[in-house]
């Protein structure tokens, strides 16, 4: 795959707590230069990214209920709404893993549905945190997302014990078919890993190592 083609798969990501305004400006500059699909940033930096990315094709993606997914549903929905007002064009929300583990699937569905309604047509990705789920739970969560017609299912926050695996991406793709996108994220730091995820069915890659990925290099910084 040509580097420019691979770049269009990448949400260029900076989500750790210590990121400064200068870090976000650098992220945006890199995204413009390398023609990444989007920058994925915390909500407080949306206005800054909007200013930096005006008149470019780079989209602004933000995270909701991040990284635990355990916020009140009303808060998640409000955060999504406010983020979109501020300029977010894609929303990555964290599913409520505790409710999945409790078997409270109706609550899981309602939580996603509320954020989806708040998005009002803005692309919604649902982060499953696959490293905490059984294969059956991954399938069930994907089925709910498919039935609700969200935009994407996403593997991971990158803030837990493990990130994306080829097996989980393949299972997610198998469950949602061609109806939804699949985003692989967490621990993807080189071209080989990114291509393995794409070959397994990923249509988006979330990574802080986007430049290393498209240049065929290894990023050993240990980031998202």
Swiss-Prot record:
UniProt keywords, alphabetically: Cytoplasm, Lyase, Schiff base
The positions flagged as active site in the entry are 92 (proton donor/acceptor), 154 (schiff-base intermediate with acetaldehyde), 183 (proton donor/acceptor)
List cystine links.
none
Q: What is its main location?
A: cytoplasm
Keyword Lyase among UniProt keywords: yes
Query: GO cellular component terms?
Result: cytoplasm
Q: What does this protein do?
A: Catalyzes a reversible aldol reaction between acetaldehyde and D-glyceraldehyde 3-phosphate to generate 2-deoxy-D-ribose 5-phosphate.
Name this polypeptide is given: Deoxyribose-phosphate aldolase
């Amino acid at each position: 795959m040509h580097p420019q083609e691979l770049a269009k798969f990448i949400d260029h990501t900076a989500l750790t707590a210590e990121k400064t305004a200068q870090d976000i400006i650098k992220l945006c500059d890199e995204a413009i230069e390398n023609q990444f699909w989007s920058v994925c940033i915390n909500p407080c930096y949306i206005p800054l990214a909007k200013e930096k990315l005006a008149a470019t094709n780079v989209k602004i993606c933000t995270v909701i209920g991040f990284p635990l997914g355990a916020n009140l549903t009303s808060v998640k929905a409000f955060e999504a709404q406010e983020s979109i007002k501020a300029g977010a064009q894609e929303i990555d929300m964290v599913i409520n893993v505790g409710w999945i583990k409790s078997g409270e699937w109706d609550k899981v569905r309602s939580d996603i549905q509320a954020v989806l309604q708040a998005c009002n047509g803005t692309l919604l990705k649902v982060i499953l945190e696959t490293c905490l789920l059984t294969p059956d739970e991954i399938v069930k969560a994907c089925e709910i997302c498919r039935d609700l017609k969200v935009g994407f299912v996403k593997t991971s926050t990158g803030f837990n014990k493990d990130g994306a695996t080829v097996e989980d991406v393949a299972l997610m793709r198998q469950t949602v078919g061609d109806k939804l996108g699949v985003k692989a994220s967490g621990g993807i730091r080189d071209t080989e890993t990114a291509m393995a995820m794409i070959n397994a069915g990923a249509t988006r890659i979330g990574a802080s190592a986007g430049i290393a990925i498209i240049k065929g290099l290894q990023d050993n910084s240990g980031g998202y």
